[in-house]
């Protein structure tokens, strides 16, 4: 056995920048951001959901600090999800629910060999079905897994006030403010019948469901803090439902 391999090495918060040696004597909880690569109107980047999930996960770990009983680390994000409703727009890459579910299951099975807990931090609503099925299976197999949504009450649906405000807070240089226009602001329940058959393009030519013209960085800071606090509280309580959603 190489004794040098067991030297204590400071543990960074990012899995992607860690080394195997740094992980060797630890059994951390790993937070895995799960996002998407999909259109977000003419003003937001394709990786908006991934950025939000990664930023929330990273801030949650910073809030946790370094508790004596558990280290926490943020994994590189899963940047592709179930985004079929956005495939009418260039740039969208959807792997679908079945592929995402399989990816998450195999991810959890592998990571559980060296982690204490796995938390998927979800930034895209289209991923929920895959997350629920995958985490339920992981838990059935005896793995300590859960998932949390980056959600807030009264949020609009897509690329509107909510997401644009958050991006103005976490990635202001990547919001094309001169492209801000109001999208379809009808209730989502009213739009769903047409979206099921024709996707988002059937109800919004620009791919916006909501009104980004009202977005502000200050509002984004408030919404982001609410997302972070909500996820952190769920993780601290650790009360998964039958689908692994932390409540």
Swiss-Prot record:
Binding site for a divalent metal cation 1: 38, 49, 124
Residues reported in the UniProt entry to bind a divalent metal cation 2: 40, 49, 163
Cofactor, how bound (note): MftE appears to bind one Fe(2+) and one Zn(2+) ion per subunit. Fe(2+) seems to be catalytically active while Zn(2+) could play an auxiliary role.
EC code(s) of this entry: 3.4.14.14
Needed cofactors: Fe(2+); Zn(2+)
Phenotype seen when the gene is deleted: Cells lacking this gene present delayed growth in ethanol as the sole growth substrate. Glycosylated mycofactocins are produced in this mutant, albeit in significantly lower amounts than wild type. MtfE can likely be complemented by an unknown peptidase present in the metabolic background of mycobacteria.
InterPro entries: Creatininase-like_sf (IPR024087), Creatininase/forma_Hydrolase (IPR003785), MftE (IPR023871)
GO terms for biological process, alphabetical: proteolysis; riboflavin biosynthetic process
Molecular function GO terms recorded: hydrolase activity, acting on carbon-nitrogen (but not peptide) bonds, in linear amides; metal ion binding; peptidase activity
Keywords: Hydrolase, Iron, Metal-binding, Protease, Zinc
Key word Cell membrane present: no
Catalytic activity: [mycofactocin precursor peptide]-C-terminal glycyl-N-{5-[(4-hydroxyphenyl)methyl]-4,4-dimethyl-2-oxopyrrolidin-3-yl}acetamide + H2O = [mycofactocin precursor peptide]-C-terminal glycine + 3-amino-5-[(4-hydroxyphenyl)methyl]-4,4-dimethyl-2-pyrrolidin-2-one
PANTHER family: 2-AMINO-5-FORMYLAMINO-6-RIBOSYLAMINOPYRIMIDIN-4(3H)-ONE 5'-MONOPHOSPHATE DEFORMYLASE, 3-DEHYDRO-SCYLLO-INOSOSE HYDROLASE
Protein task: Peptidase involved in the biosynthesis of the enzyme cofactor mycofactocin (MFT). Catalyzes cleavage of the MftC-modified MftA peptide to liberate its final two residues, which consist of a cross-linked valine-decarboxylated tyrosine dipeptide (named 3-amino-5-[(4-hydroxyphenyl)methyl]-4,4-dimethyl-2-pyrrolidin-2-one or ADHP). Is required for the in vivo ethanol assimilation in M.smegmatis.
Family: Belongs to the creatininase superfamily.
Subunit structure: Homooctamer.
Descriptive protein name: Mycofactocin precursor peptide peptidase
Annotated organism of origin: Mycolicibacterium smegmatis (strain ATCC 700084 / mc(2)155) (Mycobacterium smegmatis)
Highest classification ranks of the organism: Bacteria, Bacillati, Actinomycetota, Actinomycetes, Mycobacteriales
């Amino acid at each position: 056995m190489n004794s040098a391999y067991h030297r204590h090495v400071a543990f960074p918060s990012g899995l992607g920048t860690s080394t195997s040696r740094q992980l060797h004597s630890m059994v951390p909880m790993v937070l895995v951001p799960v996002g998407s690569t999909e259109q977000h109107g003419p003003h937001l980047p394709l990786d908006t959901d991934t950025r939000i999930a990664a930023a929330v996960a990273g801030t949650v770990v910073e809030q946790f600090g370094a508790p004596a009983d558990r280290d926490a680390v943020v994994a590189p994000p899963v940047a592709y999800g179930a985004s079929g409703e956005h495939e009418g727009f260039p740039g969208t890459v959807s792997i679908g629910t079945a592929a995402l579910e399989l990816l998450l299951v195999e991810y959890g099975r592998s990571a559980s060999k060296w982690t204490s807990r796995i938390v998927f931090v979800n930034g895209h609503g289209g991923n929920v079905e895959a997350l629920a099925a995958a985490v339920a299976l992981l838990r059935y197999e005896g793995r300590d897994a859960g998932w949390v949504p980056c959600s807030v009450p009264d949020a609009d649906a897509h690329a509107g006030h909510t997401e644009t405000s958050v991006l103005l807070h976490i990635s202001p240089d990547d919001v094309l403010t001169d492209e801000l226009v109001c999208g379809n602001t009808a209730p989502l329940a009213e739009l769903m019948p047409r979206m099921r058959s024709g996707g988002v393009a059937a109800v919004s030519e620009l791919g916006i469901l909501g009104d980004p013209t009202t977005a502000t960085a200050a509002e984004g800071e408030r919404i982001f803090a609410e997302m972070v606090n909500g996820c952190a509280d769920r993780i601290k309580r650790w009360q998964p439902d039958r689908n692994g959603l932390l409540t």
